[in-house]
Design a protein with these regions (language model features):
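Terminal substrate-recognition subdomain of acyl/acetyltransferases
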Residues: 9, 14-77, 175-198, 203-206, ...
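N-terminal pre-P-loop "Q-motif" helix
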Residues: 88-116, 612
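Pre-Walker A (Motif I) flank of P-loop NTPase domains
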Residues: 111-120, 149-150, 366
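Walker A/P-loop nucleotide-binding motif
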Residues: 117-130
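Conserved beta-hairpin
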Residues: 127, 364-383, 389-391
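Walker A/P-loop NTP-binding motif
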Residues: 129-145
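Conserved acetyl-CoA-binding loop-helix of GNAT-fold acetyltransferases
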Residues: 130-134, 433, 441-457
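Conserved Walker A/P-loop ATP-binding site and its immediately adjacent core
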Residues: 151-169
Length: 679
């Protein structure tokens, strides 16, 4: 590469740096730490040669040492290979040959109730995706001969992640003399078809949970897929290939390596074949450029090693809240930086080089950490300053639909709730990423970190703190709600990768400035959700809905609301609840009104249903799920659910309509039922 001298380079904005500018900061505020790190790492690399191209002056001589020419190993194809020799001849390394051999096991369908999984792991540049593509071609060829029609599926974060895999599927099929038809999504191949006999399709991760009839499934970069989706795929398919990168931004996060892989190994009904590809395709093992790349971009960053002494410090709450000097932290404190970023690499976050660049260079981004008293970082947090927007920009958002770059919470609050004053507040902090050391989960460290951040925010006069826009699940949502963060926005569509809805939360720090606004936004959010549960959120998990509908400190949506029921509706409700001749289907209108009353007045009344009772009325009444589906989601028998719902409705009738015993008109109904039964 030919960069300008560092003294000039740090005065220029790259395209990436231009893309991270926000209204509150101009070009002069952009930091250039990533360039400086890149330059310093290059100058400190033994085998790097640097020349001033203007003067032909050698700026840095390489230290070559005893350099041996690299010769790729000779490839030996197994004599008794079951895949076609034409496939094996496309392999570039012996490692790839052995990986192909490992995947031959997938040719046989496992016995009923059993599963066969192949797990391939590798660093970047080992040809992992390529060899899986060739294996799929070979498997499709063999299975077609056995069963005539083959349906294989490939899933990953997005179609671009499987472009190499699909490229080698095509190469493999052509080597086996097939003519292929391709379908594209943009420039990416998403489907490979051979006549009416072979179908190999890209399918989004969450959609795999409703797929049927796939002979073999490939999960590429499995560490980037949420664990619930991985468990769902495992439960649904008997032959699966999981591929994951060891180091790198797609890195095998601990969720995959410690939890999911452990689960596979311990499952008695699953045979697991593991293989690690170590041999690079284009260069020698231990190549210095690869080492430099990993080091510079923190691809191999790992969190601190945790010892028994560290657990003692945690038990004694021996913590330090770290407010680093960003220049010193990013450019001179290598050990702390690697610990900090290593937590992200090993956590559930999906990292790209741009994430490191944003953290280092974006003028509105900053970091905080929680360390033990011995200096080991145990919680990493990246934050962004938001708010303080001028009237002109706010007007463009309101009138012209302008999207405020780098100001997610103000943008959504203006667009969805019309609260323009919120964007003018002196400022807020949005937590972009918060992650706890993977070995120290569920020890209260995340909550401790939030408390420290909130203390600092109060001292600095910050108006609010926003929670990240994350894929909502019950455990994560409970963490934020337990710490006082209120939902203020939710996406109307599930994330195609995780299958989760993205939620934004906020917590007022300065009650006078942000408190009323955030409480109002939360009430509007709850009202929107309550009235959308038969629409875009009809399949949201009931426990998640229940938490999102939480009333905040006695902040009911409509405390004076009374159920709008006619006398006839009341009679049907009572007949249904007390076991009279009335079904749920004949009483849905009245039951729905009663349940809506509960949530509109929630926080103002003394009635508080048990949590599971709330999930019952959410799932069956507000989301209007069929009996069979509702029973499955709630983990009940259909008959049990039907009886339980009657009891819940009876409780609501007793509170809101003041029926405390069987009504007079029901007595005659009950008597007539008994007479009919006696006949």
């Amino acid at each position: 590469m030919i960069p300008p001298p560092l003294s000039e380079w740090v005065k220029q904005l790259t395209k990436f740096q231009q893309s991270i500018l926000v209204p509150q900061y101009g070009p002069d505020h952009v930091r250039h730490f990533l360039k400086v790190r890149f330059w310093n790492k290059l100058m400190n690399m033994n085998k790097a040669l640097a020349i001033n191209v203007d003067s032909d002056e050698v700026v840095k001589e390489p230290v070559l040492g005893n350099v041996q020419p690299w010769k790729p190993k000779e490839i030996v194809i197994p004599e008794k290979a079951r895949f076609s020799r034409a496939i094996y001849e496309l392999a570039k390394t012996q490692d790839q040959v052995e990986a192909l051999r490992a995947m031959e096991v997938l040719m046989e369908r496992p016995p009923r109730g059993k599963k066969v999984n192949v797990v391939l792991i590798a660093d970047r540049g080992r040809g992992k995706s390529a060899i899986i593509g060739l294996a799929l071609a070979a498997l499709a060829h063999r299975l077609r001969k056995v069963k005539g029609r083959v349906r294989l599926a490939v899933t990953a974060m997005n179609p671009s992640n499987v472009s190499t895999l699909m490229e080698f599927v095509v190469k493999g099929l052509k080597a086996l003399n097939y003519d292929v038809d391709l379908s594209y999504w943009g420039s990416d191949v998403v489907s490979v078809k051979v006549g009416v006999s072979i179908f190999i399709d890209y399918i989004r991760p969450y959609d795999m949970l409703s797929e049927e009839g796939r002979d073999i499934v490939v999960v590429d970069e499995a560490a980037m897929i949420p664990l619930p989706v991985l468990y769902g795929i495992h439960g649904r398919f008997s032959r699966v290939i999981y591929a994951s990168t060891i180091h790198g931004y797609e890195g095998a996060g601990r969720g995959f390596s410690l939890r999911f892989l452990k689960f596979l190994r311990e499952d008695r009904d699953t045979r697991v074949i593991e293989y690690e590809l170590k041999e690079p395709i284009r260069y020698a093992l231990g190549d210095p450029v690869e080492h430099w790349l990993f080091d510079t971009l923190l691809l191999d960053a790992e969190p601190a090693k945790i010892t028994n002494e560290d657990y003692d410090l945690i038990n004694k709450r021996g913590f330090n809240y770290v407010i680093p000097d960003l220049k010193e932290f990013f450019l001179t404190n290598e050990d702390q930086l690697r610990q900090f970023f290593g937590i992200y690499v090993q956590a559930h976050y999906r990292n790209e080089p741009d994430d490191l660049g944003m953290m280092m260079d974006a003028p509105h981004h900053f970091i905080r950490a929680l360390s033990l008293n011995n200096g080991k970082i145990v919680v990493s947090v990246e934050l962004a300053e938001e708010g303080g927007i001028n009237d002109e920009l706010i007007d463009l958002v309101v009138r012209g639909g302008l999207k405020l770059p780098g100001n997610i919470l103000p943008d959504r609050i203006i667009k969805y709730w019309g609260l323009t004053e919120f964007a003018k507040l002196r400022g807020g902090w949005r937590i972009i990423r918060i992650a706890t050391h993977p070995e120290l989960q569920d020890k209260g460290l995340g909550t401790e970190m939030l408390r420290k951040i909130e203390e600092e925010a109060r001292e600095r006069g910050i108006d609010w703190i926003g929670g990240v826009g994350f894929g909502v699940n019950a455990k994560l949502l409970n963490f934020w709600i337990r710490n006082g963060y209120m939902p203020v926005h939710i996406s109307p569509e599930r994330n195609p990768i995780s299958g989760e809805y993205s939620v934004l939360l906020a917590k007022p720090i300065n009650e006078a400035a942000g408190g009323d606004t955030i409480i109002y936004a939360n009430k509007e959010f709850r009202l929107r959700l309550l009235n959308s549960l038969q629409g875009p959120f009809h399949d949201m998990e009931p426990d998640v809905v229940r938490m999102l509908l939480t009333d905040w400190g006695g902040q009911p949506l409509d405390p004076s609301y009374s159920p709008r029921l006619t006398d006839a509706q009341v009679r049907r409700l009572v007949a249904y609840s007390w076991g009279g001749p009335m079904t749920y289907e004949n009483t849905t209108d009245a039951i729905t009104e009663l349940v809506r009353t509960y949530y509109l007045r929630k926080g103002a009344d003394s009635i508080e249903l048990p949590l599971f009772y709330e999930e019952v009325i959410i799932c069956k009444v507000l989301q209007a799920r069929p009996w069979k589906e509702a029973a499955r989601v709630l983990g009940l028998r259909k008959s049990t659910l039907m009886l339980l719902l009657r009891e819940v409705v009876k409780l609501l009738i007793q509170y809101y309509i003041k029926y405390t015993e069987i009504p007079e008109f029901m007595i005659s109904v009950t008597k007539s039922q008994r007479k009919g039964q006696s006949r």
